[in-house]
């Protein structure tokens, strides 16, 4: 009788211990409030700390931020504010209304990392839905085989996918291509192409702007976590979405690169009495791009810091 009681006690203790282990984080963070855009995490010492949210849920409920940028949802807005250390509030629900202005300081059309990652998430979701398990008498299709099928369908015979071929592949899925950040449809088409280029850059190991099958496989590998790249300028690093100005032109940090408008500045748009020749302006933009070497060298450090 006592042996039976001892066995039951051991089972009960094991079950209680098993239930407590996964709840340890929730217990530590139970009374911790981190605020919008942040979440509670547990340090190596077992203490609670607040960090920027690692990944927001992908539900689509666009909001316009006070910075004039459209976000997929409230969480993405507050996460961006946390990562950039800036104060961003919800201006109104829905996409930001495009300002019909002739002002040359308007921001260039760019693919932000959030846009790139959202396109990638939708592609992976679509491809995973096509997986067919092996049956009793039939062979199914695994993830690699599905990617191989699409790769061969859009490859022109050189065993690589360039940006136009990759774009044709993306356009096979209505959900994937429906990334709408701008009110103007032409800008959204441009955004789609820019995000395809950003996806190619993720796994283009030899920098030829084409993907071999292995690079294509890495790009859309569900377990691959794209790094968050920053832009460098004058010994400083800037988060995705940061902006700077060159005369009447605006430059935006997008996926680790500075992207600038190309407006011709007249006397009314220039600041103060400063004048710059086209050569000086071109040189400044080249200076922005030159600093990307520094950003690439510190890529791993920056990723860890985030």
Swiss-Prot record:
Annotated Pfam families: EF-hand_FSTL1, FOLN, Kazal_2, VWF
Signal peptide coordinates: 1-18
GO cellular component, one term: extracellular space
Phosphoserine carried by residues: 163
Tissue expr: During central nervous system development, strongly expressed in the telencephalon, diencephalon, brainstem, limbic system and spinal cord. Widely expressed in all organs.
Domain of life: Eukaryota
Glycan-bearing residues: 142, 173, 178
Disulfide topology: 29-40, 34-50, 52-82, 56-75, 64-96
Consequence of gene loss (knockout): Deletion mice die at birth from respiratory distress and show multiple defects in lung development. In addition, skeletal development is strongly impaired.
Biological processes, Gene Ontology terms: endothelial cell differentiation; endothelial cell migration; hematopoietic stem cell homeostasis; negative regulation of apoptotic process
Domain VWFC, chain residue ranges per copy: 231-285
Entry's Gene Ontology molecular function annotations: calcium ion binding; heparin binding
Compartments where found: Secreted
SUPFAM superfamilies documented for this protein: EF-hand, FnI-like domain, Kazal-type serine protease inhibitors
Sorted UniProt keywords: Disulfide bond, Glycoprotein, Heparin-binding, Phosphoprotein, Repeat, Secreted, Signal
Function: Secreted glycoprotein that is involved in various physiological processes, such as angiogenesis, regulation of the immune response, cell proliferation and differentiation. Plays a role in the development of the central nervous system, skeletal system, lungs, and ureter. Promotes endothelial cell survival, migration and differentiation into network structures in an AKT-dependent manner. Also promotes survival of cardiac myocytes. Initiates various signaling cascades by activating different receptors on the cell surface such as DIP2A, TLR4 or BMP receptors.
Protein name, UniProt field: Follistatin-related protein 1
């Amino acid at each position: 009788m006592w042996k039976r009681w001892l066995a039951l006690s051991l089972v009960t203790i094991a079950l209680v211990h098993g239930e407590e282990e996964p709840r340890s984080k929730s217990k530590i963070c139970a009374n911790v409030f981190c605020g919008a855009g942040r979440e509670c995490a547990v340090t190596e010492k077992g203490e609670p700390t607040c960090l920027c949210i690692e990944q927001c849920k992908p539900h689509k409920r666009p909001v316009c931020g006070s910075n004039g940028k459209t976000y997929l949802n409230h969480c993405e807005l507050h996460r961006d504010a946390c990562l950039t250390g800036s104060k961003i509030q919800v201006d109104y629900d829905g996409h930001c209304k495009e300002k019909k202005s002739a002002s040359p300081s308007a921001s260039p059309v760019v693919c932000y990392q959030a846009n790139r990652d959202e396109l990638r998430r939708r592609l992976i979701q679509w491809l995973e839905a096509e997986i067919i398990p092996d049956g009793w008498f039939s062979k199914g299709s695994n993830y690699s085989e599905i990617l191989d099928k699409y790769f061969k369908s859009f490859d022109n015979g050189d065993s690589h996918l360039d940006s136009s071929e990759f774009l044709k592949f993306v356009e096979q899925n209505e959900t994937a291509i429906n990334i709408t950040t701008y009110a103007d449809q032409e800008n959204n088409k441009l955004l789609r192409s820019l995000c395809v280029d950003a996806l190619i850059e993720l796994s283009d190991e030899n920098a030829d702007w084409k993907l071999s099958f292995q690079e294509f496989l890495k790009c859309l590998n569900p377990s691959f976590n794209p790094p968050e790249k920053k832009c460098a300028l004058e010994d400083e690093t800037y988060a995705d979405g940061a902006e700077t100005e060159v005369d009447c032109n605006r430059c935006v940090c997008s996926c680790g690169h500075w992207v600038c408008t190309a407006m011709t500045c007249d006397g009314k748009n220039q600041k103060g009495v400063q004048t710059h020749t086209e050569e000086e302006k071109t040189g400044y933009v080249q200076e922005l791009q030159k600093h990307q070497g520094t950003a690439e060298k510190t890529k791993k450090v920056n990723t860890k810091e985030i």
